[in-house]
Regions:
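Short Asp/Glu-rich motifs
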Residues: 29-30, 51, 82-83
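Divalent-metal coordination cores built from histidine and acidic residues
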Residues: 56-173
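Short capping/connector residues at structural and topological boundaries
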Residues: 10-11, 44, 55, 147
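Fold-independent oxyanion-binding glycine-rich loops
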Residues: 20-22, 34-35, 42, 46, ...
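Histidine-rich, glycine-flanked metal-binding segment
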Residues: 1-42
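Activation segment
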Residues: 21, 52-54, 72
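Di-metal (Zn2+ and/or Mg2+/Mn2+) metal-binding site signature of metallo-dependent hydrolases
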Residues: 38-62
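Divalent metal-coordination and catalytic microenvironments
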Residues: 15, 36, 47, 67, ...
Length: 177
């Protein structure tokens, strides 16, 4: 915020800061002595590739160890939804090319119980991640879902129908979260 730091007390309830004071009058049922420490809001990591890691590491280490409380997944245009049944291995392979995680680990680490982006977000929440997860829908998944293997050909141009279908998938994904 650009504000000066303050030395003081704060009280929190249910994950929210509810009161700040500097006169020692902020009482609480539990006291954490943070003398000579810095208390900050959680940090947002706006560029991660934790889309698959949440499947086998719902604490999303080491992000949580660095004060990260919210991560943005779906960067570099690669996501795991939307996906048509049977195309999951291709999305895992595409992610393997971006992130140094084997497609086999991705395939076994995620439940793959979805087709749409909202289903992916629901599946992630069922894993009970320790951090807030927000996402982008990746163009690679959208194009592959609509165009199949043609999406991988750099010279392939989507047809007018494919462009309409791509736009529909993006609208559906945005509406889903």
């Amino acid at each position: 915020s650009g504000s000066e730091t303050i030395r003081g007390d704060m009280i929190g309830k249910e994950g929210e800061i509810t009161r700040v004071g500097s006169d020692g009058s902020v009482g609480a049922a539990q006291v954490i002595d943070a003398t000579d420490r810095i208390v900050t809001p959680g940090f947002i990591d706006a560029h991660t590739h934790l889309d698959a890691q949440v499947g086998w590491d719902p604490e999303l280490t080491p992000s949580i160890y660095h004060g990260i409380t919210t991560v943005l997944v779906g960067n570099c245009g690669v996501t795991f939804a939307p996906v048509s049944p049977g195309n999951e291995p291709k999305l895992a392979e595409i992610m393997e090319g971006v992130e140094d995680i084997s497609a086999k680990a991705i395939m076994t680490g995620l439940p793959w119980s979805w087709t749409g982006y909202g289903g992916y977000l629901d599946a992630v929440q069922k894993l009970k991640p320790a951090l807030n997860i927000v996402g982008l829908v990746g163009h690679a998944a959208v194009r592959y879902d609509v165009m199949g293997d043609r999406a991988i050909d750099h010279d392939a141009v989507p047809t007018d129908d494919e462009i309409r279908n791509i736009a529909d998938r993006v609208r559906e994904s945005v509406a889903a979260g």
